[in-house]
Every structure is written in structure tokens, then in C-alpha cells.
């Protein structure tokens, strides 16, 4: 903790007010270092029992995974980053600009270009698709809209809007952390005005007790709503349109499930073209955007293939197989 008050003052002189830094940074640093030390000790123990041919991470910018990748590289073990989603970040700098692994197995052409533009060698980027999205290939063949609505006790003949909540991004310095809260209210008001059936699918990272929060918000506004933190596949297949905040990759999963999306964008993030269709965090804007998609289904029918190819590459359920084969190619095996 020595010297931290001085560090805080230097930050403040540069326009970042971090008074009190010394009250929380030492404890946070200690907790991170303890976890990293534990993980690397486990990795060392594992490596003494079995030869390691490759280390694979789903991201390499947070302390634990970055440390693991650096540890492997120091030992000459090939490292692979399989991003768990696309990055829709336009603003730089951003924490995701750097990748420490030897290889990137990209989710999509968009993701491959994104990393290449930030200086990662293109010859070390392999297109595989996103393994955790393979399930959607089977979902669209086995779960119909009618079945999903029956399971979720939704009316068959009234529009269903799926609202996927998000979290305020914190990987760069341009985000507007008020958008998410404004969007929560705007979607509820739009659903009330338009008479939609509303399903609220919580972000996996939100506290589970927020399910009660969303339910109470809907009740206060007189909006019948089904709130869940699970059942994404059923929710997508039951919906006519998905509404999301910011750069969430749930819009790509919705596309794999053959459902269009309206996005309330966060500052600093964006898409090259429609879809998705964008809306400000107001009831009027959201109602207009969703209404346009509902009234013109050909907008989605005509663009779905290009959207999926751009952000998910090949929709065949084979990303896991391709990633495993690529790991076999780049690893060092005895």
C-alpha cells in the first residue's frame, strides 16, 4: 500500500479522480495475485503429471487467463485464444485490442478482420466459428415457434418480443452507463403501448435476485411479463423479434435461431449495416423499430444469410469439431 496516495494524486492531476485509491487497490491486487498464484501452481502440478500440448482460453485479457497464457508461452507451450463471441467495439483503445496468445480461432469473418486491424498477424488467425453456438443448428430443427410458446404458456397469435438485458460495458472510457436502465423502462412502456407479449431474458452475469427486480418493474407498469435467467433457446424460438442493449452477441444467437433483432446501441459500439435495426432508448423509438420488423418480415428473410455469415460464419453445428482439429494442428504433441 506504500505510495498509493501519491499514485492517486497523480491520477487526479491527469483528470481521473481516484481519491481513496489506497483504500481498495491493495486488497483487490492481493485477491487477484492470490488467485493467479493458485492457478499457476495448479498448472505446474498438472504439467508434471501429463505433457501439455496446448493451452486454450476463451479470453486472454483478464488477469487469470492472461497469466495462464503467459505461463504457457514461457514454457514453449502453444497458446490458443478462442473468443467466446464477436467484438462490436469501434472505440480505441479498448482492453480487447491486445491478444497475448499465439493463435486466434475466430468466431467469424468479422472477428478475424477485427483482430487483424489491431495488428494481430492474419496468418495466425483461423476461422472456426463459435463452439458454444453449435447447439443452434439442432434447435432450429427441433423447436418450433408453436412448441416454444406452448411450453412458455404464451398466446400463439399475439406478437412476442424477447428483451435480453445487458450490463454496462467497462472495457473502454466512452460508455454511457445510463442507456441500459433507460432501455429497461422504454421496452416495458413500448410493450404496454403496443400490446406485445413480453419475455425478459436476463443476462447470465446479472445477480439472480434481479429476476424479482424485473418482475416488479413490469408489475408496476401493468405489463404482464415472463422473466427468466435461463431458457434462451426456448425464448428465442418463441419470439417474433428480439430487443437487446448494446453489443450483445445474443443477437447473433437469435439470428442462428432465425429471429431478427432490434438493438439499443451503446456509445462506442456499432455494426457495419442493417440488420440489426437500431433504436434509441425511448418507448417510441423501440416501438417503431420493432413494428417495422414485425410488419416487414422480408427485411429479415432477405438479410439473415448474410448476417449469419458475417458474424457466425458457417451455421452447421461444426465449430467445436473445427476448433478441436485446429488445436491438434497447432499444438505440440508427444
Language model segments and positions:
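Active-site and donor-binding regions of nucleotide-sugar-utilizing enzymes
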Residues: 1-135, 251
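Structural motif
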Residues: 53-56, 103, 160, 197, ...
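Short beta-strand scaffold positions
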Residues: 57, 106, 244-245, 280
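Short, charged/polar "capping" segments at the starts of alpha-helices
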Residues: 64-65, 111-114, 171-172, 206-213, ...
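Catalytic binding pocket for nucleotide-activated donors in carbohydrate/polymer assembly enzymes
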Residues: 98-101, 119-129, 212-222, 237, ...
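Conserved catalytic-core segment of nucleotide-activated headgroup transferases in glycan assembly
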Residues: 131-216
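Active-site donor-binding acidic/aromatic loop of nucleotide-activated sugar
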Residues: 222-230
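C-terminal alpha-helical cap of glycosyltransferases
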Residues: 315-334
Amino acid at each position: 500500500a506504500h505510495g498509493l496516495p501519491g499514485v492517486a494524486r497523480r491520477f487526479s492531476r491527469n483528470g481521473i479522480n481516484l481519491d481513496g485509491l489506497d483504500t481498495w487497490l491493495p486488497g483487490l491486487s492481493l485477491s487477484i495475485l492470490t488467485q493467479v498464484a493458485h492457478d499457476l501452481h495448479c498448472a505446474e502440478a498438472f504439467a508434471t503429471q501429463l505433457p501439455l500440448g496446448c493451452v486454450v482460453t476463451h479470453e486472454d485479457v483478464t488477469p487469470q487467463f492472461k497469466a495462464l497464457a503467459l505461463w504457457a508461452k514461457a514454457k514453449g507451450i502453444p497458446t490458443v485464444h478462442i473468443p467466446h463471441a464477436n467484438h462490436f467495439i469501434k472505440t480505441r483503445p479498448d482492453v480487447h485490442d491486445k491478444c497475448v496468445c499465439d493463435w486466434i480461432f475466430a468466431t467469424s469473418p468479422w472477428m478475424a478482420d477485427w483482430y487483424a486491424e489491431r495488428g494481430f498477424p492474419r496468418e495466425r488467425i483461423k476461422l472456426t466459428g463459435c463452439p458454444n453456438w453449435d447447439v443452434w443448428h439442432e434447435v432450429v430443427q427441433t423447436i418450433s415457434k408453436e412448441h416454444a410458446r406452448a411450453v412458455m404458456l404464451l398466446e400463439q397469435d399475439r406478437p412476442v418480443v424477447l428483451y435480453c438485458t445487458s450490463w454496462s460495458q467497462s472495457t473502454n472510457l466512452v460508455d454511457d452507463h445510463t442507456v441500459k436502465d433507460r432501455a429497461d423502462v422504454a421496452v416495458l412502456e413500448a410493450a404496454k403501448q403496443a400490446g406485445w407479449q413480453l419475455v425478459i431474458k436476463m443476462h447470465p452475469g446479472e445477480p439472480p435476485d434481479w429476476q424479482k427486480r424485473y418482475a416488479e418493474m413490469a408489475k408496476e407498469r401493468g405489463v404482464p411479463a415472463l422473466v427468466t435467467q435461463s431458457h434462451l433457446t426456448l425464448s428465442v424460438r418463441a419470439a417474433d423479434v428480439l430487443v437487446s442493449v448494446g453489443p450483445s452477441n445474443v443477437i447473433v444467437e437469435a439470428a442462428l435461431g432465425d429471429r431478427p433483432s432490434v438493438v439499443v446501441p451503446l456509445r462506442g459500439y456499432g455494426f457495419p449495416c442493417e440488420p440489426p435495426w437500431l433504436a434509441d432508448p425511448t418507448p417510441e423509438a423501440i416501438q417503431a423499430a420493432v413494428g417495422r420488423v414485425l410488419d416487414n418480415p422480408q427485411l429479415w428473410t432477405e438479410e439473415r444469410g448474410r448476417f449469419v455469415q458475417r458474424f457466425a460464419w458457417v451455421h452447421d453445428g461444426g465449430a467445436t469439431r473445427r476448433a478441436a482439429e485446429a488445436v491438434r494442428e497447432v499444438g505440440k504433441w508427444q
